[in-house]
């Protein structure tokens, strides 16, 4: 222990680096592990140690049916320049269009095989919908063949969080509960629907409504009817790889909607989320259903005592409930959107969702907004969340009062166009022509910024440098570009969409691994999912990816899952990946696989 009461030099560290004179890092050939459409731009980026002065030709090899290889292109790699701590060269093989199996080679480095094919993106979203989202379903027993992923978790949700309390994982309760429940009291009705937010097990409302809206966008644009999962909410049971006659995407939309509806039914407004009461549960590794005893806490019982389906053990999760108008708006945007998708699959839930959305919108207009904020659990910027709600309500109801709100909020949205542009574009068909025309300057400015960002590194996407790596930023940028390309094709080209997807799939600094587990020849196999204790992965999960360790080291650990900033699955990125994979197949000129 360090001595107490001392000032000045108290401890000195002597660090002796263990280095190998003349060591050179082997080249990395960054490329899409999934492959490329025949007509697409195809660029591989070769990452070299800055002290590597050797030169070698880059080669593209075609793999025959018998495993033999034939060189189809040999060319000197074109120097791009230096970025971070490495030097970069590139091989453009866009002229190779013949479908088949290929590998890239530079010196002694050879990549895993990848495809050139018309349908290269067609099934890229299947693992995410087939496996990742079912495994993430809270309040359900999830089974896959002979494997139980987890039991019916959190049957004892949830207790009212204590007042004036700053909690773990960026949750906090303000000076009031804004509910009829006292701190520590059980709030009934919350043990239904929703997904584990990330590698851990909380229900973060902001993530829930982001996922619902993204899944609805996918449904409305492409209508994927894929059915490989059976969901029985009455039995609270999910069976992976067992069709049940209902499109899986609609089932996931319903599952998220159930949790959002439950919050309004329970307390009258959206809550921040539901999270474990202490650090011991927060660090829980294993089956989510073993985190708690599943029995509602009864303070009249002794610790460990169980009676009448209740328990004296206060292990129930806490609900953080201080009102935030931003969360209300974000949630009703998702409910309004979900009501469109669920009209046939569950008309009663669709009516309930839309009823809540219209009622809460009207209520919010009668008072000053509730502005409670803490961490990243109380919603996005208020005007952005309100704009999203207005857009979704307009799309659902066609009521002109929501068009008026959209128009009134547009100047604020224009100032943060990158954050709001997909909502802004979604409203175009329901707004006057002047609305679209007024958007053009912002679209041009955004397109110009995209070009500038693409030139900043050899991968052509914005690479973040914070403590959470940037896969989410890259996917969001690609979806932004897709929305603008479809609405303003003369201003925004499709290239940024492809660059974003290729970054996720292996065209990035540090390695050539796909950041979508199970998608691409080599993908993330050690990740921060709810099975991270096994040093394993969940197919279809998307990790944050490349973290830039200060000052210049691009890192993604494949040997240690617990670096959450590099390896933690989060549900919004999963939903966005499903959306982006569909967009890519659309741009490739072939309809996505159903």
Locate each region found by the language model.
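Aromatic (Trp/Tyr) and acidic
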Residues: 34, 42-112, 137-209, 213, ...
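Short, solvent-exposed loop/turn and secondary-structure capping segments
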Residues: 114-115, 223-227, 265, 271-275, ...
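Short coil/linker segments at helix-helix boundaries
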Residues: 217-255, 313-319, 337-353
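Carboxylate/His-rich catalytic cores and anion/metal-binding grooves
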Residues: 247-271
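Internal metal/ion-chelating core segments
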Residues: 322, 332-336, 341, 348-385, ...
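Solenoid-like repeat scaffolds
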Residues: 410-416
């Amino acid at each position: 222990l360090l001595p107490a009461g001392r000032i000045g030099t108290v401890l000195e560290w002597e660090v002796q680096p263990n280095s190998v004179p003349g060591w050179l890092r082997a080249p990395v050939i960054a490329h899409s592990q999934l492959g490329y459409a025949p007509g697409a731009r195809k660029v591989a980026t070769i990452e070299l140690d800055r002290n590597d002065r050797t030169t070698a030709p880059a080669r593209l090899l075609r793999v025959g049916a018998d495993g033999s290889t034939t060189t189809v292109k040999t060319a000197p790699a074109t120097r791009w320049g230096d970025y971070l701590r490495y030097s970069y060269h590139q091989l453009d093989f866009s002229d190779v269009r013949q479908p088949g199996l290929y590998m890239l080679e530079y010196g002694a480095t050879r990549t895993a095989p990848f495809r050139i094919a018309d349908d290269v993106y067609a099934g890229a979203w299947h693992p995410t919908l087939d496996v990742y989202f079912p495994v993430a379903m809270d309040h359900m027993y999830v089974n896959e063949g002979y494997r139980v992923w987890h039991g019916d978790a959190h049957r004892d949700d949830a207790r009212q969080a204590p007042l004036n309390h700053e909690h773990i994982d960026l949750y906090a309760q303000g000076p009031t509960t804004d509910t009829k429940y006292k701190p520590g009291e059980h709030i009934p009705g919350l043990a239904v629907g929703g997904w584990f937010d990330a590698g851990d097990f909380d229900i973060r409302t902001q993530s829930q409504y982001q996922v619902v809206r993204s899944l609805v966008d996918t449904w409305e644009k492409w209508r994927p009817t894929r059915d490989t999962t059976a969901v029985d909410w009455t039995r609270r049971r999910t069976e992976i790889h067992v069709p049940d006659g209902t499109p899986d995407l609609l089932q996931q939309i319903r599952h998220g909607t159930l949790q959002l509806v439950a919050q309004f039914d329970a307390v009258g407004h959206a809550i921040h989320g539901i999270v474990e009461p202490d650090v011991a549960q927060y660090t829980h590794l294993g089956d989510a259903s073993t985190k708690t005893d599943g029995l509602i806490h009864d303070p009249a019982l002794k610790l460990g005592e169980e009676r009448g389906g209740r328990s004296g053990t206060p292990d129930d999760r806490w609900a953080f409930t201080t009102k935030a108008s931003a969360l209300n708006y974000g949630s009703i945007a998702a409910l309004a959107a979900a009501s469109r998708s669920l009209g046939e699959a569950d008309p009663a839930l669709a009516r309930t969702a839309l009823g809540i959305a219209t009622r809460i919108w009207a209520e919010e207009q009668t008072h000053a907004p509730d502005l409670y904020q803490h961490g990243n659990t109380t919603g996005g910027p208020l005007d952005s969340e309100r704009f999203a709600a207005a857009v979704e309500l307009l799309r659902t109801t066609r009521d002109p009062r929501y068009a008026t709100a959209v128009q009134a909020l547009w100047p604020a949205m224009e100032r943060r166009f990158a954050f709001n542009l997909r909502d802004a574009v979604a409203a175009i068909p329901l707004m006057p022509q002047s609305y679209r025309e007024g958007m053009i300057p912002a679209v041009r400015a955004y397109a110009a910024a995209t070009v500038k960002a693409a030139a900043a590194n050899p991968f052509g996407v914005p690479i973040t440098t914070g403590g959470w790596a940037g896969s989410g930023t890259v996917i969001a940028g690609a979806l932004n570009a897709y929305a603008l390309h479809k609405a303003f094709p003369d201003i925004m080209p499709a290239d940024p969409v492809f660059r974003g997807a290729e970054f996720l799939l292996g065209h990035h600094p540090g390695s050539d691994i796909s950041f979508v587990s199970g998608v691409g020849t080599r993908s993330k196999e050690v990740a921060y999912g709810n099975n991270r204790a096994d040093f394993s992965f969940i197919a279809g999960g998307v990790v944050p990816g490349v973290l830039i360790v200060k000052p210049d080291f691009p890192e993604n650990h494949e040997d240690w899952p617990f670096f959450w900033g590099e390896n933690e699955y989060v549900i919004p990125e999963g939903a966005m990946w499903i959306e982006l994979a569909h967009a890519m197949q659309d741009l490739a000129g072939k309809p996505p696989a159903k």
